[in-house]
A protein has these predicted regions:
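Flexible N-terminal pre-Rossmann segment of NAD(P)-dependent oxidoreductases
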Residues: 1-11
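Conserved glycine-rich cofactor-binding loop
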Residues: 12, 19-21
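The beta1-alpha1 cofactor-binding region of Rossmann-like NAD(H)/NADP(H)-dependent oxidoreductases
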Residues: 45, 64-76, 104
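Conserved NAD(P)H cofactor-binding loop of Rossmann-fold oxidoreductase domains
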Residues: 91-95
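Substrate-binding pocket helix/loop in short-chain dehydrogenase/reductase
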Residues: 98-99, 103-111
Length: 114
């Protein structure tokens, strides 16, 4: 990865949506660059897999199952941290439907999440 050229030793990164896709790739790249990680996803199984990869880089990894649209869950996670140097606010979702057909409650959720 390109971040390998950057030294992030003694830095802590929090990555939301870290269980899959771009969030997973970011978390792994940050670990490869030496950062310790706090990873958040809605799925424990995904967090376990990503955490295992991160630990291969000798980085500390703390994982939390969390719905980032739940303010209290996020607030509690943040309160437990000594420091956060890097934030990758990656969690997101979409509804595969033409925007004129999306239900109001679904649109509100997507806006809140993204």
């Amino acid at each position: 990865m390109y971040l390998k050229k950057i030294n992030l030793k003694n830095k802590t990164a929090l990555v939301t949506g870290a269980g899959k896709g771009i969030g997973k790739a970011c978390a792994i790249a940050l670990a490869e660059a030496g950062a310790d990680l706090i990873i958040i996803s809605r799925t424990q199984k995904d967090l376990n897999a990503v955490s295992k990869i991160i630990k291969k880089f000798k980085s500390k990894c703390t994982s939390y199952v969390c719905d980032v649209t739940n303010y209290n869950q996020i607030k509690n996670i943040i309160a437990k941290q000594k420091k956060i140097d890097i934030l990758v606010n990656n969690a997101g979702n979409n509804i595969p439907e033409h925007f004129t057909k999306v239900k109001k409650k679904d649109m509100e959720y997507i806006v809140k999440l993204n």
